[in-house]
A protein has these predicted regions:
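Acidic, surface-exposed loops and disordered segments
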Residues: 1-120
Length: 120
């Protein structure tokens, strides 16, 4: 998911486009108490659909979801480094608010986020 000042979007990889989920600035939900995140131009929120690994409540499914998010997080960090963009992988965020705002299913869990911006 992509959280911008004007709205929150789902990235559609097949069509390489963003689909608006909700209008409005929800960077505060991503911030998890860290004010700098509210000023980042964009935040990428990594969601894992644990039902893809079987029982969404099982420890194994949760581990697999966390591992997938970690792999994607590393790729985001590597790309940002190559593109001279600033980012930091974070796990603190308002999970319950993000679940509502992004209209997530019960099996979908916010795992990590990456605020992305320019170096100061």
């Amino acid at each position: 998911y992509v959280v911008l000042p004007e709205g929150s979007y789902l990235y559609d990889a097949k069509n390489h486009q963003l689909t608006l989920i909700v209008a409005g600035d929800y960077r505060g939900a991503v911030a998890g108490g860290q004010a700098f995140v509210k000023t980042a131009p964009v935040s990428l929120v990594l969601i894992s659909d644990l039902s893809r690994f079987g029982d969404a409540k099982s420890p194994r499914s949760q581990l697999m979801g966390a591992m997938d998010a970690g792999i994607v997080s590393q790729n985001i960090s590597i790309f940002c480094s190559a593109a001279n963009l600033a980012t930091v992988p974070r796990a603190s965020m308002d999970n319950e608010q993000l679940k509502k705002v992004l209209k997530l299913k019960d099996s979908q869990m916010p795992m990590m986020n990456h605020p992305v911006g320019h170096f100061k």
